């Protein structure tokens, strides 16, 4: 018989041997799992041999050395999940989210008997949820959202005694919600939105005594809300929106103390229960797009913590209770598309935090209250389609943050207040279909960020002001059905972004030649005016139908069906004999004056003394050369090589210029920028600024090579960039769009940041760019970024601030603080740069179809879904999506609402420099031909110890790391970004 100590030793030895065998098996299991993945070479390169506990994403138990956790999230892995995963008996956590995995979830996953967390979200997994999942008795968190899973939700999930989080959102699941799942005593989070679930909401829902989050949005659930809903006292978020639920909203729903109650997009009828006014914890109340009727309960004014109140798209009647003015934290109030009546309550003036007010399509009457101007943070005001009367309050100019103002389809009268032109940030102004009279104020031209202007169907008189030509961002102008006269201003031809122009049914005279340079114009209607002359057939006019010109008997052109005859026997003389005699006498006098001037001796004019008010000289404009790249060219050469700046050499348009490509033998191409306006008034002042700009040299700035200024035209000469602008690469059509991999995007971001950092911190004088955008980031043949158009920016003054006379920049990129105050500093550029980062990350435009990219990212961030917006080209080429998240974080830091919360461009460079991988030394001719990483500017040298391929390596530095920078500026990927 074996002695007891010997037996104990024997059992211990056997246990150790079993552990050793298990450990060895875990290593081989991981290698088998790797075989089922694709795109592993660059991310799982260390999964080859040796100590697997040191492999990427692997965490082992400190005692047994068995695999305890596997985290391969965000690595862009393809392929499938191997059934071998079931052999990891000791694994506690599996995180494979945000990859490109496909296929089915293997049944063997149920053999991971120790598993507590399983996260397979944001992949392309399909098939059913395996019933074997119900074997995971220790599972606490099961997250399978954002896949392609089908079938029913297994009722056996109710047998998981420790399940706290179940998130199956955004799949293709069908059937009913298993009733047994409502009896899970520990379940806290149930996310089922975005599936095809049917059936009703069970009365057993309140058996989930620990449940605080219940989201079934975007399904096909039917029936009423259970009367027992008031017993779900632990609920904090209840989202039943966009289903087919019906019946009335139960009275006892008011017993809930939820922060979010979303019932929109259903078929609820009846009145809004007054008891909802007792739900003091409500931050979001959304009852929109139902069939609710009756008045708005005045008791809702008690909801002093509510930030968003949505009631649009119902059948609500009666007046707006003035008590709503007590909702002191309200940001969004949407009451549009109802049958509300009465006056707009002046108490709304107390809602100083209101951001969006929508009262459209109701029956409101009376004047617009002056108190609205007290809503100083109001960004959007829509009162379209009511019965409002009186005049437009001039006090609206106090709404400095306003971007959208729509007062159309009312009975407003009087003139357009000139004060509206002081709302600097306005991008949409719609006053159409009213009874407004008087002229269009010329000051409207100061709304330089306006995208849409609609003044149609009023009683406006006078001329179209020439100042309209200052609206360089404008895309749509509608002045139809008024009494406007005069000519179409020549300045309209400077609107390079104009896509729609409607001037029909007015009394406009003259011709249409001024519109020939509106190259973006797609829709033109000048019908039923008094226009005359030839309709051009070149440029963009060939795209317009004859209907665009109807009702103008004086217009002619072969494709309009009327020939342009210079004279005829039957025609009346166009001018009188007396006028002809006067013209002849005047011409003779002018001829005599010219002869006297020619015969009189004079000295040749000196170019630099020419001013705009002096006559144009016959001497060719002088070409001022700032760098040797232009040393062999003269003005005549450039005109010859571009055939006097012929259209066929045009490579781009800007808000203030047209750009041509000038190519000659044995020289690098040159970009010639022709400014639209002959500004500034003082050539000497402008020359001084250009010479200062020409002296600025940096590898990430486009060099100004020379210039030519004269009353006949102002030309600037720059280095030519082979790959155009970043805008072109990201946003042009499919035929032109170039796919950018992640590394290239990172290097573009770093290069642009280095150029901007040089302007802000190392340039003398230091410069604010004022218009940072993807169109002003040019790419050379190696896709290295070069910042352009910094040349006409003002130098930073000693106080580091500057008050401009008008807001500069481009819609979508403008710092909201700058737009509100017109006070400019370096942080305004940082904000714009952050928007460019978002473009690089998403491939989306800053503003597209009225969708604001920054607002989109903020909303996705609030839902922890920001990675859904990543450009697919990044997902295909990025080795570590964690880097993408860090750049998202950096972009949101740069776009913080408070300028003081944003980093400097030096700090931005340091963060990006940690993410960009240094190029290895070239080993072949092919490698030598590849673009090399830009040299780091001198101001980075002090941070050389920060070099590394990840934030972790940077954070180990004794210097300030990017991780510490993130801490310094606050947590960004949260709901409190702004």
From Swiss-Prot:
Its EC number is 2.7.11.1. ATP binds at residues 651-659, 673. InterPro entries: Kinase-like_dom_sf (IPR011009), Leu-rich_rpt (IPR001611), Leu-rich_rpt_typical-subtyp (IPR003591), LRR_dom_sf (IPR032675), LRR_N_plant-typ (IPR013210), Plant_LRR-RLKs (IPR050647), Prot_kinase_dom (IPR000719), Protein_kinase_ATP_BS (IPR017441). GO terms for cellular component: membrane; plasma membrane. Keywords: ATP-binding, Cell membrane, Glycoprotein, Growth regulation, Kinase, Leucine-rich repeat, Membrane, Nucleotide-binding, Receptor, Repeat, Serine/threonine-protein kinase, Signal, Stress response, Transferase, Transmembrane, Transmembrane helix. Residues 645-916 form the Protein kinase domain. It is found in: Cell membrane. The chain crosses the membrane at residues 578-598. GO terms for biological process: heat acclimation; regulation of cell growth. Residues 1-24 form the signal peptide. It catalyses: L-seryl-[protein] + ATP = O-phospho-L-seryl-[protein] + ADP + H(+); L-threonyl-[protein] + ATP = O-phospho-L-threonyl-[protein] + ADP + H(+). Residues 599-978 are cytoplasmic. The active site is at 771 (proton acceptor). The keyword Repeat applies. Residues 25-577 are extracellular. LRR repeats lie at residues 66-87, 88-112, 114-136, 137-159, 160-184, 186-208, 209-232, 233-257, 259-278, 279-302, 304-327, 328-350, 352-375, 377-399, 400-423, 424-447, 449-470, 471-494, 496-518, 519-543. It is a single-pass type I membrane protein. GO terms for molecular function: ATP binding; protein serine kinase activity; protein serine/threonine kinase activity; receptor serine/threonine kinase binding. Belongs to the protein kinase superfamily. Ser/Thr protein kinase family. This is LRR receptor-like serine/threonine-protein kinase ER1. It comes from Oryza sativa subsp. japonica. The gene is ER1.
